[in-house]
Amino acid sequence: MEIFGHVVSGLGEGKFFVGLTHYKNKFEELTGFTPFEGTLNVKLKHNFNLDEFNPIEFDGFEIDGKKYFGGKVLLIKLFNKQGNSINCAVVAPKKTDHSKKTLEIIAPIQLRKFLLLKNSDVVKLVI
């Protein structure tokens, strides 16, 4: 399945969360790659129901009394308008400030730099 969306600025929290050792190790286990510390945010025209695609679930954890929530991961391939692509994953935390129209994507590299992306660029996600 192909889905199109636009690159948008995030909330600035992806770098922190992906950088946490527990999340980083879990994402590596589930995706097969060590994620770059940050996410690419892609806004869709319609709500996205990750559960329709059999995502992989992961549990939350606790550090020094602070609870970090689990979520779901879905492996995808992301393409820029030039047709360059990379294997990556949509991450859907159980607790998020994003709408169901905004996807957070992790990859082994900085997607904006590797795929030469800027805000409003159209990207294609292949599931």
From Swiss-Prot:
InterPro entries: Archaeal_Riboflavin_Kinase, RibK_CTP-dep, Riboflavin_kinase_archaeal, Riboflavin_kinase_CTP-dep, Riboflavin_kinase_dom_sf
Cofactor note: Binds 1 Mg(2+) ion per subunit.
Cofactor(s) this protein requires: Mg(2+)
One Pfam family per UniProt: CTP-dep_RFKase
Reaction(s) catalysed (UniProt annotation): riboflavin + CTP = CDP + FMN + H(+)
Record GO terms (molecular function): magnesium ion binding; nucleotide binding; riboflavin kinase activity
Binding site for Mg(2+): 39, 41
Single GO biological process annotation from the record: FMN biosynthetic process
Superkingdom in the source lineage: Archaea
Keywords: Flavoprotein, FMN, Kinase, Magnesium, Metal-binding, Nucleotide-binding, Transferase
Residues binding FMN, per UniProt: 96, 104
Binding-site list for CDP: 10-15, 109-112
Enzyme Commission number, as recorded: 2.7.1.161
Pathway connected to this protein: Cofactor biosynthesis; FMN biosynthesis; FMN from riboflavin (CTP route): step 1/1
Protein function: Catalyzes the CTP-dependent phosphorylation of riboflavin (vitamin B2) to form flavin mononucleotide (FMN).
Family of this protein: Belongs to the archaeal riboflavin kinase family.
PANTHER family, per the entry: RIBOFLAVIN KINASE
Protein name as catalogued: Riboflavin kinase
Gene: ribK
